[in-house]
Amino acid sequence: MLVSYNWLQDFLNLDQEPHALAEKITRTGVEIADVKHPEEGLKKLVVGKVIDCEGVEGTHLHLTHVDVGEDEPLQIVCGAPNVAAGELVIVALHGARIAGNEKIKKGKIRGIESYGMICGLQEIGFSDSVVPEEFADGIYVFPEDADVKPGQDVYEALGMDDYILDFDITPNRADTLGMEGAAYEVGAIVDQKPKIGDVVLKEDGPDWTSSLEANVDEKLAPKFYLRKLTGVKIQPSPLWMQRRLWNAGIRPINNVVDVTNYVMLLTGQPMHAYDAKTFETGKLEVRLANKGEKLTLLNEKEVELDPRDIIITDGEKPVMMAGVMGGLNSEITSETTDVILESAIFDPTLVRKSALRHANRTEASSRYEKGVNWDATEKAINMAALLLRNDAQATIDEGIIKATDTKREPVVVKTTVSHINDVLGSEISAEEMIKIFDRLGFVVDQDGDNIAVHVPNRRWDISIPADLVEEVGRIYGYDNLKSTQPLLAETHGGYSEKEEMMRRMKAIVEGQGLMEAISYSLTSPEKAVRYTKDPKDIVKVQMPLNSSRSVMRQNLMTGLVDAASYNFARKQTQLALFEQGRVYDHEGGTFNEHEHLAALYSGNTFAENWQHLTQKVDFYFVKGQLTNLFTAIGIDPEKVTYEAAPILGMHPTRTAAIYIDKQYVGMIGMIAHAVTLADKALRGAELYGYEINLDTIIPMLTKGMTAVPAPKFPAIERDLSLLVDKEITNQEVENVIKSNAGKYLVDLKVIDVYEGSHIAIGKKSFAYNLTFLNRKDTLTDKVVNNAMDKIIAGLENDLDIKVR
């Protein structure tokens, strides 16, 4: 919003220099992006009167003599097609500076002496977008009734002596998209009440309201007012109005269109004017467009309307895209004599989408989409009628058609003085606070510490106590708030025990050679419940971007499998990844978060070289990695058990649930073939991994670790090769071995698993290494042999297992 400093003076007695005022406004929360002074850099530009004008033979040039208030007229050669005797024009004298810092000097053109230059508006710094069309390709000519005389500076006459404050307005402060709103804002800052009066209008024509039937959908246009003016004389606007329009970045067109734009700039209420002949049908309708309907807009662009566009029709065909731009078939022309004015409020969302859809954002649409003052609708239409009576000799017919007239009651926001002070860290008294609200134009009811603030409709951004805190803070002045140190309790700093353990576990798995992955917390409903023994109620996202990111994850393994797929697609198949993060559920109607740790392996356990043959990752390798992790954090491997369990997304026979002291803490195993085969990149690759719940495990850990001295006596190792049924698991075998081995068994490892040739159908071979140790005495073969006999007998009796 380009705000004129001179126009602000109509409402306020400003004694501050414009740049200083802009700085003060910026400090209160409405940023002033720039301050421009149009005459800056220009000099020796005066009003001149063309005394005579003759064509130069054989050229497009004109030889003129121009009165510039000096003793003798100046001879100036001009090439503009619209120069003529008797015109009041802009003259750049010898030594003048015009736009682009160009210096004007006397010289010869086609051998003819020229002592200056007759200028167009663009040549003295005006943008092409604001120059009236009749002067777009020529010099500017002052209106005949302009209060100017030869020799005077042009700056004041053209509004170039003004200062233009560029309000960089955020969507919540659209109340300042009108001069009255800006005056309220600046008035509150400088502690003045702006002089803003009501419009007193006397109607002098017959009642017209029965001549037009207006059918308006209240949802599309909650307020829709119409007025009619007759006997309108179309002509250029007075120069004072044109100055204000082009300083605000709007091109003057004619007195009717200019009045609607001027009133919009003044009140913030967009308006539109129709040639009354448009509604000879006697009907006006506001509705959504029908598919296939078309409309040629005022910019001569034909658009195919969308069923979501609000349009104004004459009962049959569209004549305006509501809130955006009028139609060419209803425009004001030089032949127009009767005008219908519209002042309305349209649905902001639909207007915004229409403007974007048709790439046609206008001053009106930008205001509608941010919001307009519901109390300005009638004032705006009456003011426009009054101005047209003065500038177009119009007759104002009696009556306003209020097709819709939804009322909006002013908001009352309740809070306390102490709350505002607590938030600001201030000690502002109730009296001073009420004075601040009075400066803003808010009425306050006070009851001790409690206040109820009545907010006028022009400030629709104020609705909650926090808004009042902001208003008090910015008007009081953020610079005036005392600086205080934050009151914080002294702590020793550092991490909690849980955080320390999580960081330690992360360091351990990194030491095992795993690389950290960080995946999305959002996933699909299908993936959310995979890799979990007992899936919980999922946490749904209210407005998901797509179905693949519509719920919160219940496992980390999904992200690691996705990461593996990404790497496999790039020929990186030797993977060892881990992730430590949170998973989420909605069990019991409450939202829960849990810390998990997951790891995923593929390919070989280590790179093949001349010393070592390759070895593929398998269940037992991953289990060994997890056992090492448990041992490193102080969990006795003897307390950890693995039981076969069906888990969605995992292999049915190569997966186990993990228990510590009979409490479920996670799962381990191979990703199901169905999952990897469904992925084009993985193509059925064997992926093994584990996922454990740290929230369950960490409380089980004991503080510190007990040092165990190195054994003084030798250990004895024995290997045991068994032929077992295919359905029997390693855990079952280990349980029997441990229960029969006696107290000297200190380690039990799987050293081989085999099934294939030389093994009976339905059977498989397990080979174990058993370590026996007596820490207090030398262990004898007799004791170990006795233990082995008991183990073999137990295996035969309990599981029908034979020794190979």
From Swiss-Prot:
One GO cellular component term: phenylalanine-tRNA ligase complex
Example GO biological process: phenylalanyl-tRNA aminoacylation
Keyword Secreted: no
Subcellular location: Cytoplasm
Annotated tRNA-binding domain residues: 39-155
Cofactor note: Binds 2 magnesium ions per tetramer.
Family per similarity comment: Belongs to the phenylalanyl-tRNA synthetase beta subunit family. Type 1 subfamily.
Matches recorded under SMART domains: B3_4, B5, FDX-ACB
Domain B5: 408-483
Key word Transcription regulation present: no
EC top class named in words: ligase
Key words, A-Z: Aminoacyl-tRNA synthetase, ATP-binding, Cytoplasm, Ligase, Magnesium, Metal-binding, Nucleotide-binding, Protein biosynthesis, RNA-binding, tRNA-binding
Catalytic reaction(s) noted: tRNA(Phe) + L-phenylalanine + ATP = L-phenylalanyl-tRNA(Phe) + AMP + diphosphate + H(+)
InterPro entries tied to this protein: aa-tRNA-synth_II/BPL/LPL (IPR045864), B3/B4_tRNA-bd (IPR005146), DNA-bd_dom_put_sf (IPR009061), Fdx_antiC-bd (IPR005121), Fdx_antiC-bd_sf (IPR036690), NA-bd_OB-fold (IPR012340), Phe-tRNA-ligase_IIc_bsu (IPR045060), Phe-tRNA-ligase_IIc_bsu_bact (IPR004532)
NCBIfam families the UniProt entry points to: pheT_bact (TIGR00472), YtpR (NF045760)
CDD domains cross-referenced by the UniProt entry: PheRS_beta_core, tRNA_bind_bactPheRS
Domain called FDX-ACB: residue spans: 711-804
Name of the protein described by the UniProt record: Phenylalanine--tRNA ligase beta subunit
GO MF annotations in UniProt: ATP binding; catalytic activity, acting on a protein; magnesium ion binding; phenylalanine-tRNA ligase activity; transferase activity; tRNA binding
HAMAP family: Phe_tRNA_synth_beta1
